Amino acid sequence: MKRLLVFLAAALLLIPAASAQEQDAPKMNKKNLVIKEWNTDAKGNHKTLDHVTTFNADGKKVEEIEYSQDGQKWRKRFEYDQNGKVSRELVYDNRNRLQTYKKFEFNELGKKKIQYTYNAKGKLLSIKQYEYIAQ
């Protein structure tokens, strides 16, 4: 029984130390950052670009591009409102032609409330509503 109590006490002492380390970990500065993801074959001989994510001077994601071995598969561009929330997400095909775009509305807490998806000609394709339930 004493061993169990000593073990539990030691475990409780380690929890705050782990939390402090997580809080002290430096956050990645995303200002003007470009992240490139590469795929390499098992032998390390053939390297191909897989995905690129670009952030602006404010650290907001402004573009994502997905690649295949044949080149660009698709591209997403992100636009922001005056509150710094994504207001539109535009999706382009491999030839940079607009395919679909999404518009977003947010609730009073800044969480997504409604997502509208349109085709390239502006026809509404779908509406997604978000519901947040605290438990």
Segments and roles (model prediction):
Residues 1-4, 21:
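Positively charged n-region of N-terminal signal peptides that target proteins for export
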Residues 7-16:
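Bacterial N-terminal signal peptides
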Residues 21-135:
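Buried hydrophobic residues that stabilize the cores of well-folded domains
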